[in-house]
Regions:
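Gram-negative/organellar outer-membrane beta-barrel architecture
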Residues: 1-152, 187-189, 216-238, 243
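Short, surface-exposed helix-loop/turn micro-motifs enriched in polar/charged residues
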Residues: 27, 147, 167, 183-186, ...
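Short beta-turn/strand-loop junction motif enriched in small, turn-promoting residues
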Residues: 44, 139-143, 160-162, 176-180, ...
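Charged/polar, low-hydrophobicity segments characteristic of intrinsically disordered regions
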Residues: 44-47, 173-174, 203-206
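Transmembrane beta-barrel strand/turn architecture of Gram-negative outer membrane proteins
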Residues: 77-86, 153-161, 167-199
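Short secondary-structure junctions and interdomain/linker hinges
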Residues: 89-92, 96, 143, 162-163, ...
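Extracytoplasmic gating/loop element in the C-terminal half of outer-membrane beta-barrel translocons
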Residues: 186-263
Length: 263
């Protein structure tokens, strides 16, 4: 594949949706791009309990190198594993909970901003976290792939518990509303807010910052270029990200002539 940020992306996956006839699902996925490189193994038992609770686990290894973007220079390598549970509370609503352990190794450079270098000097180049997550989602759109009406909402909370090195909380909420105009035309209004902060005397890890700009947040800007900036020692202006974000936008979708449902 190809994206404006990642450029050429190579990906491969092996998925079994009915593992050994049990109804369980297992997926091995590998992605490699200019910024993100990930290998992940996931397992899901959608019928873990008679009450409709699903259970799954994930193991992953992820490398992040945002130096090709206009983002402050650093690299990170993460390895982790976690367990998750999901429960449908209504026809269109679902809640989920999870607990995972993560170890992230960070590399900073002479051109990295002072807060990044200070973070590594204070906490070391390896950060370990025991992360608890909770989320809620509601999808009342008329189509998952080609929506023209309905509402999509999601909220999530992520807390690095005081068991290991990092201690932070991160929350986000997104709301999308689709208005149909007939003939496949639709107006989509989107709002997205997020807030994060360290606690118990610990800083928010800079690699947990929010960014804005680019497809998926604010079109017309390069990826992750909005927000606080700094000029590095080489004279390049780069984005720092921040602990809060608020985005509101509107998008108009219409069928491409001769493209069927493509918009």
């Amino acid at each position: 594949g190809f994206s404006s940020a990642e450029k050429v992306i190579l990906s491969a996956s092996i998925a079994q949706q009915n593992l050994f006839g049990t109804g369980n699902a297992m997926t091995l996925q590998m992605n490699t791009g200019r910024i993100n490189r990930t290998i992940a193994l996931s397992f899901t038992n959608p019928y873990w309990s008679i009450d409709g609770v699903s259970m799954g686990w994930d193991i992953y290894q992820r490398n992040v190198d945002p130096t090709s973007l206009s983002v402050a220079t650093y690299k990170s390598s993460s390895i982790g594993a976690g367990v998750r549970f999901g429960y449908p509370i209504a026809e269109d609503d679902r809640i989920n909970f999870g607990l995972s352990v993560d170890q992230t190794t960070i590399k900073v450079y002479d051109t990295s901003p002072a807060p990044y270098i200070s973070f590594v000097n204070t906490f070391g180049d390896t950060a370990r976290s025991l992360v608890a997550t909770a989320g809620w989602g509601r999808d009342r759109r008329d189509s998952f792939l080609y929506p023209t009406s309905g509402v999509y909402q999601r909220a999530s909370v992520e807390v690095a518990t005081p068991v290991l090195d990092m201690r932070y909380a991160r929350a986000s909420y997104q709301h999308q509303h689709w208005f149909p105009f007939g003939g496949g035309h639709a107006l989509m209004l989107n709002g997205d807010v997020g807030y994060a902060h360290g606690y118990d005397g610990k800083e928010l890890p800079f690699y947990k910052n929010f960014y804005a700009g680019g497809i998926g947040s604010v079109r017309g800007y390069q990826q992750s270029t909005l927000g606080p900036r700094y000029t590095d020692s080489s004279g390049y202006v780069r984005s720092l990200g921040g602990n809060r974000r608020a985005i509101a936008n509107a998008e108009y979708y219409f069928p491409m002539p001769g493209g069927g449902k493509d918009k």
